[in-house]
Amino acid sequence: MRREGTMRLHRTFLLRVYLKESAVITYPASKKIYCQGKIFPTIRVGMREIQLTNGDSLTLYDTSGPYSDPNISIKSPQGLPRLREPWIKVRPRKTQLAFAKEGVITPEMEYAAIRENQKRELKKNTDQERERRLQGNSLSARIPNPITPEFIRNEIACGRAILPANINHPESEPMIIGRHFLVKVNANIGNSSLTSSVEEEVEKLIWALRWGADTVMDLSTGKKIKEIRETILRHSPVPIGTVPLYEALEKVDGDVKALTWEIFRDTLISQAEQGVDYFTIHAGVLNRFIPLTQKRVTGIVSRGGSLMAKWCLLHREENFLYTHFTEICEIMRAYDVSFSLGDGLRPGSIADANDEAQFAELKIQGELNRIAWKYGVQVMNEGPGHIPLNLIEENMTKQLAYCREAPFYTLGPLTTDIAPGYDHIGSAIGAAFIAWQGCALLCYVTPKEHLGLPNKQDVKEGLIAYKIAAHAADLAKGHPAARQRDYLLSQARFEFRWHDQFNLALDAETARLFHDETLPKEAAKHAHFCSLCGPKFCAYKTSHEVRDTLQKVT
């Protein structure tokens, strides 16, 4: 399936999904490589290596899993190889948090550490002045170089990071979420009652993996919820999250009043048995907080939050997710499912940002964190929402304080309400800012936000916007693995190595397409100009001439 030579190196992304055939992801000028573990020598961590025309190469964090390995054939319904199964079989049935607290480094922890480092070491001849000038400001975060398995173990033990890895999802490749690591991006997929099929959702999953989704949430609310989730899990090398409330509500035909703790509990167990890695649980929406939303412009915009608020009012009882929280912890501990404590009262408009209802729920999230940790369950906290730039820092500061530095997972935040059709841009601005402040996981927003169910193109555009935001934050934080790609691309740009510029880009296909709109011939890929400035006004070309003149003078 791989073609050699120049044409192979310059090919754009190919994705084919047939439920009875192979699914393949390829990247231009790239090959799949594996890094071996040291503590656990049988570990092989997949990465992507980009080959450059000047002989250099770049190793990248890779979310594509076996789909980009030409030596692995993936067919449905069997799904992916069960990578973690041998590790799980030979050890006690404990959570990653329990192992971490006991001082035990698991294979998953070493795997995640190797991924974070991306085979990257600082060169001995690094420009020290440049390093001092560009070193990041991590805002009290501690990012070691290199990141070790012991560091990951300690971060998990302290509750500052999670490694979501259900024992029944052995296909997943271990990854770490926390503010002392690379900023991660989540993609939402899933059908609705009006559209989408099992095949379409698997295709969206693999498409999301190709564009860098670190985690994926299946938010299906229509028919075949269980079948879609099972197929997604068996075909996903990244952690899968869900909102169990959606399926529980489907079981009672959408009748909120008919929903019970018992129905929800059975749904929770069923999804944990399937292998879901993290659950969004809206346990912080309490009776006494609901009246606080009355003055809001947009009320309660979280689906789960609004459903639980309605349930509380119909039954005149406290939220059963809160009253049964310890039982939920026991279920999740049995499978090593992580909490993603839902922000059911997040603001859905700039007018409602940072209000009393939002922060009241955040405080409860902090209390629930401590209960989850007591039960040995990993936990992260979901956050807003719609927040203007000047109020974002307060969100991060309060989350760190209330939730004792547990990972923060935010939807954006959107920094303005006026961008329907472009909310992926308005929210990526907020995402970059809050990720620099310490947010660990960014939930992408697509151009269809507020408008409809995303299609494949929307998924791509949302992920590209958020990978830019995450990378910008990693640069600002000074993550040791962040800057090399920027350096190599800038070098290629200055040296007019057009193919390398394209291949180092987040979206090589679009970069090449834009260039070729006006200069499509192969000769233009070696020209010392582009169509923006032409041969006479290219600043890079002139800069080379200036350098040559200076060298002659000196």
UniProtKB/Swiss-Prot annotation:
Domain of life: Bacteria
GO MF terms, alphabetically ordered: 4 iron, 4 sulfur cluster binding; carbon-carbon lyase activity; zinc ion binding
Binding site for [4Fe-4S] cluster: 530, 533, 538
GO CC terms in record: cytosol
Catalytic class of the enzyme: lyase
Family statement: Belongs to the ThiC family.
Function summary: Catalyzes the synthesis of the hydroxymethylpyrimidine phosphate (HMP-P) moiety of thiamine from aminoimidazole ribotide (AIR) in a radical S-adenosyl-L-methionine (SAM)-dependent reaction.
Name listed for the protein in its UniProt record: Phosphomethylpyrimidine synthase
Gene name linked to the record: thiC
